[in-house]
Amino acid sequence: MRKLLLTAFAVFTLFFADAQLKTPAPSPTQSIKQDFGLSAIELSYSRPGVKGRMIFGDLVPFGKVWRTGANNATTITFGDAVTIGGVKVAAGKYGLLTIPDKKSWVIIITKQTDVTSPADYKAHQDLVRVEAKTMDMEDKIETFTIQFSNIKPSSCELHIMWDKTAVSLPISADVETKVMAQIDQLMNKDNRPYFGAAMYYMDNGKDLNQALAWFDKAVEMQSNAFWIHHQRANCLAKL
């Protein structure tokens, strides 16, 4: 009995000692918050390295659901509704899964936020499935990377890259409808956003005469604001 207690104590001591030792994570976690449209998209995933291994078709098998990272499930959170693959996805937190293959991947947005292995995956929880052609890269990406690119007012792309393979997922948002609704609402109030509304009309190819009228109102309110005069001149040049 005494020997058993001593053994248990030794094991506990070693475990406690190891628990105090902090070392770098083999696949560190990254969280990204990207402003997009009128809100933001947040992404959380872990980043394994190539480390001399063969990645796709070996470490990551072809034709099987992949958590798209390491450790925990990869999640994506939309602050506002977006459209992916022609499907409207409501604001909220979702899982980001993929099924890699040699020439194309299936990218999945799922209600499941805890998938870490193919056995956990439930296809009926899918919201979106998009086929994305693979792109061969000249330079190797040692650390698994997901990033946003080509960010525009109402569209962006989510790039998934590792080793010498990349895929891209287009994302869009109906920004115009919401901005126009805001303008209509705020123009019926006392403190009207003449300059902001005029800029939106001018920058997005809308009614320039209306934009000019709003610039004129903005000048009346802030006659010494040189930037308003400058943008008003830009509007006149486009008429």
Locate each region found by the language model.
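Canonical positions in the second alpha-helix
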Residues: 217-218
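Structural motif corresponding to the intra-repeat A-B loop/turn of tetratricopeptide repeats
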Residues: 204-205, 239
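Bacterial Sec-dependent N-terminal signal peptides
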Residues: 1-22
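Structural register within alpha-helical repeat arrays
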Residues: 196-198, 232-234
